[in-house]
């Protein structure tokens, strides 16, 4: 859920350190000879092609008018097979984007591994992030553009993307892999639309988050303030987007002080820096945070205090108008019959094991669950051992349920 706020914090702390620790940096001039990874400044398609894979990009329009950037890896690096293949859809976490799945080298990035394993890989982008800032009638300068949270992402974005992909490929069904908020939107979409859920052959949930009262990240504590104060500080439009003029200094600093930036990530998200490829951290911060709406941030803030997985709380008066009841309705996860596999981490500061224990019994068709005691929230997408411990199992399960 909140995991990519980690990267924002990393940028702010590291950038500040660059001006207050000059003597430290100068003490080892060899640091400056480190070269940034070129992917820092590439878009999604460029990253894919840089590693030798074919790339396609599309714009998908939702029922409520948002235009989403969707990226495709139609074949593996050395594959000559251009025919139909099973489709795997990957949905990123809060404040993330499609680059999450291709940020490491090909042998450690799920998007590339799936393509090499013979799958047609599609990567979504939530409304309001770097690649989904368009609308049929609105623009990002308008407050109305930003009136959404993960509720709308689940009810509009995910269905639009999946149906577009099935129509484009001719496939009758897809496999869905989500991380953090990407699982949240999956749970909403599949519980809201049973017919869509029937066309999802398997749902792989990595570090899933539905409620988070036990989240231990210091970032949660920082934002644990009254909702009115959050609105006063953040405003009412978008937040946490990339700041153009900071991208160069931040990526350079996280190249020179890669372990420092890695420790910041782990301090906030959990896990151990030894399981991160610190030579890639400049790439991570080069694309994140990718932005979202303040309303989405508020919705997550509400779930840190809620005892159930529920829709956005507008207040009793507005709730009556929107939901015909004074409180937000709960999402009915139990209605989902899709085969679901879950991976969780013991040191995950956002998807805490206590909250996971509450979620798992609600998953009606839980076909697999694996818990990694040492993993934090970022290990699912960037862990050095993720290929061996999880990605290979995902491919194995997808093959089994083909």
What are these regions (language model features)?
Residues 144-168:
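Alpha/beta-hydrolase active-site loop
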Residues 338, 352-361:
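Short alpha-helix in the alpha/beta-hydrolase fold that links the catalytic acid
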């Amino acid at each position: 859920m909140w995991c990519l706020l980690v990267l924002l914090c990393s940028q702010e702390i590291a950038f500040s350190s660059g001006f207050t620790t000059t003597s430290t940096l100068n003490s080892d001039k060899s640091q400056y000879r480190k070269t940034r990874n070129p992917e820092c400044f590439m878009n999604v398609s460029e990253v894919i092609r840089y590693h030798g894979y074919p790339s396609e990009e599309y714009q998908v329009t939702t029922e409520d008018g948002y235009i989403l950037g969707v990226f495709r890896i139609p074949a593996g690096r050395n594959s000559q097979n251009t025919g139909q293949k099973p489709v795997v859809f990957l949905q990123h976490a809060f404040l993330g984007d499609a680059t999450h799945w291709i940020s490491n080298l090909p042998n450690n990035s799920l998007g590339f591994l799936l393509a090499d394993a013979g799958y047609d890989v599609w990567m979504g982008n939530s409304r309001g992030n770097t690649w989904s800032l368009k609308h049929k009638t609105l623009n990002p300068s308008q407050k109305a553009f930003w009136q959404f949270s993960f509720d709308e992402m689940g009810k509009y974005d995910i269905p639009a993307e999946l149906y577009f992909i099935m129509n484009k490929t001719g496939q009758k069904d897809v496999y869905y892999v989500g991380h953090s908020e990407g699982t949240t939107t999956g749970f909403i979409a599949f519980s809201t639309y049973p017919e869509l859920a029937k066309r999802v052959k398997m749902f792989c949930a990595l570090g899933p988050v539905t409620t988070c009262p036990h989240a231990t990240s210091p970032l949660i504590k920082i934002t644990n303030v009254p909702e009115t104060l959050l609105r006063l500080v953040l405003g009412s439009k978008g937040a946490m987007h990339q700041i153009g003029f900071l991208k160069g200094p931040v990526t350079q600093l996280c190249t020179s002080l890669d372990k420092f930036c890695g420790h910041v990530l782990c301090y906030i998200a959990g896990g151990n820096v030894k399981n991160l490829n610190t030579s890639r951290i400049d790439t991570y911060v080069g694309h994140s945070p990718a932005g979202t709406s303040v309303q989405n941030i508020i919705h997550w803030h509400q779930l840190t205090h809620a005892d159930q997985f529920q829709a956005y709380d507008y207040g009793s008066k507005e709730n009556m108008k929107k939901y015909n009841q004074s409180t937000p309705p709960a999402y009915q996860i139990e209605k989902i019959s899709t085969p679901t596999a879950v991976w969780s981490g013991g040191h995950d500061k956002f998807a805490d094991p206590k909250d996971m224990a509450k979620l798992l019994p609600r998953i009606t068709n839980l076909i697999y669950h694996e818990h990694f005691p040492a993993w934090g929230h970022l290990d699912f997408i960037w862990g050095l051992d993720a290929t061996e411990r999880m990605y290979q199992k995902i491919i194995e399960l997808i093959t089994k349920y083909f």
